[in-house]
């Protein structure tokens, strides 16, 4: 390592003083903590009066740690987090500052916590900025696509270490409040830089934090104090409206509470939100309804890919009660003409993905995306799940973020798309035998490659090949959203949607 570790430590202290609310009285303690962690016997002769960008400093720390056998290469991010954790303000200080700011300006409080999350490297912005994203124009609504390059593939040594590590049930999951300060291990990320804010939602303690993955602007999470399964009911809508009243510039939504149509974590009740207007929220209404018991609520079907009912009104209680009524009706609703069955024996299939916010008129809004997770022999992954020919692009469940029109695609797709382009330009011969080998990273795309080669040949220019591959991905994402619609965009589906609205009393 070319830089003196003692000077690197002083750079970290200088950075924390400028960016992590570190008080003058904290410097000696923080310096000694860093000296202890890095096994350095004494500090530099003098503090520094400037520092390099944080990641450059941390790269030096990691190099030093590897040279001195303080951490394995695969432990790099966890070790960085441990270092930064020694420089973080304590939870009480963060909560106090946040609440003082929120008392006069909630937006300023949110900005404070977000900046702290970035400055502490909890949100790894240097990595997140590597993500590739673009907008797709479509007559039924624009969508956004991101290829997630910020999440590195797991190192084989890390996988082996996780397999051999003692199994622990602490914390119970990565959304539990006990994750604040958690040291991490081979199987779980370190969270010494995580800070959460307690908030009251429907008379319960919940905890607010920003997501480390930042899939969209100010991507945040609200999680229940208790480790309990995801569940959507009338209380969900109360909590969501409490949240948007606390933070009026934000939306909040919940993944569905059933497998296949829910998110990746169903074991811990939580919501996701942010300040960005995601594509579905901008979609117009295409058909309006009235209900004699809820005359002051504007009700409509949204002109969007999946099946969405939008409720808007000044009266919070009335909007919430109508949402609860629709949820109750949907939970028990079946229509075999369009493959909707509420239950198989005692297993429920119908649920919703709800999203709450204020509109431009400052009215309460809930968008309810109707979901159904039933499977059958012809659709083993789900009747309203992406069909198997789309699994090379997206096989996982379609959660709230994708349902709202923002696709987060795996980082592997970037290199795989490049490989497909090479076939379309003729750089790589089209060899179906080689593509059929499951060890070939392009094997999952064999159908896509066959279609593109048949339609456009294998003598395209680089630009033409890139366009064809991107167009294919764009079309696949549109089709994926269409798959999730419980009422399809044809005459049969629209009539079925009307029957459900009639069932609800509209």
Language-model segment annotations:
Residues 1-229, 305-306, 319-323, 329-406, ...:
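Active-site microenvironments that recognize anionic phosphate/pyrophosphate groups
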Residues 235, 244-267, 273-334:
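Catalytic or ion-translocation cores adjacent to nucleophile or general acid/base/metal-coordination motifs
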Residues 192-197, 225-252:
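Helical scaffold of the NTase/Pol beta-like nucleotidyltransferase catalytic core
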